[in-house]
Swiss-Prot record:
One of its GO terms (cellular component) is nucleus. Residues 199-209 have a biased composition (Basic and acidic residues). GO terms for biological process: cell division; centriole replication; G2/M transition of mitotic cell cycle; gastrulation; Golgi organization; histoblast morphogenesis; negative regulation of cell size; positive regulation of cell population proliferation. Its EC number is 3.1.3.48. Residues 316-432 form the Rhodanese domain. This protein functions as a dosage-dependent inducer in mitotic control. It is a tyrosine protein phosphatase required for progression of the cell cycle. It may directly dephosphorylate Cdk1 and activate the Cdk1 activity. The lineage of its organism: Eukaryota, Metazoa, Ecdysozoa, Arthropoda, Hexapoda. GO terms for molecular function: protein tyrosine phosphatase activity. The keyword Cell division applies. The modification Phosphoserine is found at S455. Residues 182-218 are annotated as: Disordered. The active site is at C379. This is M-phase inducer phosphatase. Belongs to the MPI phosphatase family.
Amino acid sequence: MLWETIVEENNCSMDCNISNNTSSSSSINKMSGSRRARRSLELMSMDQEELSFYDDDVVPQDQQRSASPELMGLLSPEGSPQRFQIVRQPKILPAMGVSSDHTPARSFRIFNSLSSTCSMESSMDDEYMELFEMESQSQQTALGFPSGLNSLISGQIKEQPAAKSPAGLSMRRPSVRRCLSMTESNTNSTTTPPPKTPETARDCFKRPEPPASANCSPIQSKRHRCAAVEKENCPAPSPLSQVTISHPPPLRKCMSLNDAEIMSALARSENRNEPELIGDFSKAYALPLMEGRHRDLKSISSETVARLLKGEFSDKVASYRIIDCRYPYEFEGGHIEGAKNLYTTEQILDEFLTVQQTELQQQQNAESGHKRNIIIFHCEFSSERGPKMSRFLRNLDRERNTNAYPALHYPEIYLLHNGYKEFFESHVELCEPHAYRTMLDPAYNEAYRHFRAKSKSWNGDGLGGATGRLKKSRSRLML
């Protein structure tokens, strides 16, 4: 009985529990259904709320509800580059007693990244265009000055009127150097110059065209060119001074004007029917000539020199100088009467081609009239030293008178044929002293070497390899 009673009690309790569980489950189901209905109502009433990305909307605190994006289906699927985020912020209502029943419909403002980027770029482009328009308008109203210049200038820009030039004619100096195409009329023009343009500024640096006039000869062009150069070197006259037209200077004498005279002189010198002409091709030689070993030099015999010393040519020769080119120890051993010892080129320069000597020679040539002033060179045999000094004087004299060719300071130069050796053998009475000392005299071997080296150094020959040349000259002189 006891066990039956216990079983019945357990069954009752189980029935109660089952009933209780059934009632509880039904109540739970009812509660879950009510909650689902409430959520559906909340979703239906979500149109009254405003969801935004920005912080510019306000919602009353009593209406704040939590809505998950998962429920709204606003999130993109996994892996999509477009992701949305809903931000809801409280909205502060204005403090007004009566609120309007009709409120504007609230909607969602959802933008993706691409649309937001495009809108931002378009807004920035609009702002830049507005800035460019404002800058262009400010440049147009800035009186032609570059942009930004107004920020550098603090004061007001003032323009001073140009000073009026004094009354009267004024000369305008050309902006570039005078050339062939510019004439005197262009210089003295008083008209206002035209405004400079890029074309004119570029043309002023070009070479001007030569004058196209058929009457303008090359000589006239040179004349205008010389006048232009002289005007540039002269100081500019004052504006109030009277303008005077300067005439071009006469042409200077040049070598081209004497071409006819030179050609006629050369023709006369080459003509065998006429006598030999002196260096300036003006007249014939005063002394009789003979054939010598040097065809470029005019040689005379010992007999002619003796006659000159005796005065037989006094009607033709105003003065003469005999230059002995031997070494001093030879000259002291015996020389021609009145001869002068010059054996280096430096001595020739000092004797003949200084400024004082050339001026004195020109004066003597002018005073002598038709008579001549002659020079005679010689050495021991007139084979090396005498001809060398004679050529040196003629060449340097020709160089000094290049601008006055064929004029010369010493146009008449002679060479004594066979030198002092032959003259001493035939006219010993005209020698001082009556002796003859050779260059290779054994007693003066040291003096020979000394003066030989000295003459070569003065003449610029140098001392290198002098031994072979000395042996060659000695063997030639001993023949």
